Amino acid sequence: MKFYNIFVFVALILAITIGQSEAGWLKKIGKKIERVGQHTRDATIQGLGVAQQAANVAATARG
């Protein structure tokens, strides 16, 4: 029973400490992930444009 009380107390102290700390490192990781997503989106849009142009050229060549 004492172990449970000590565990709850330590967990509470850790939660308070972590909650008040700045989430700078987490924010940096989030921004990097967001940037990768944006680059992937932009590359996909550009690739679709090139594929559409190639399809138009192929359709024009067939007559």
UniProtKB/Swiss-Prot annotation:
<keyword id="KW-0399">Innate immunity</keyword>
<keyword id="KW-0044">Antibiotic</keyword>
<dbReference type="GO" id="GO:0005615">
    <property type="term" value="C:extracellular space"/>
</dbReference>
<dbReference type="GO" id="GO:0050829">
    <property type="term" value="P:defense response to Gram-negative bacterium"/>
</dbReference>
<feature type="signal peptide">
    <location>
        <begin position="1"/>
        <end position="23"/>
    </location>
</feature>
<dbReference type="InterPro" id="IPR020400">
    <property type="entry name" value="Cecropin_insect"/>
</dbReference>
<protein>
    <recommendedName>
        <fullName>Cecropin-A1</fullName>
    </recommendedName>
</protein>
<keyword id="KW-0964">Secreted</keyword>
<comment type="similarity">
    <text>Belongs to the cecropin family.</text>
</comment>
<dbReference type="GO" id="GO:0045087">
    <property type="term" value="P:innate immune response"/>
</dbReference>
<dbReference type="GO" id="GO:0005576">
    <property type="term" value="C:extracellular region"/>
</dbReference>
<dbReference type="Pfam" id="PF00272">
    <property type="entry name" value="Cecropin"/>
</dbReference>
<keyword id="KW-0732">Signal</keyword>
<keyword id="KW-0027">Amidation</keyword>
<feature type="modified residue" description="Arginine amide">
    <location>
        <position position="62"/>
    </location>
</feature>
<keyword id="KW-0391">Immunity</keyword>
<keyword id="KW-0929">Antimicrobial</keyword>
<dbReference type="GO" id="GO:0019731">
    <property type="term" value="P:antibacterial humoral response"/>
</dbReference>
<dbReference type="GO" id="GO:0050830">
    <property type="term" value="P:defense response to Gram-positive bacterium"/>
</dbReference>
<dbReference type="InterPro" id="IPR000875">
    <property type="entry name" value="Cecropin"/>
</dbReference>
<comment type="function">
    <text>Cecropins have lytic and antibacterial activity against several Gram-positive and Gram-negative bacteria.</text>
</comment>
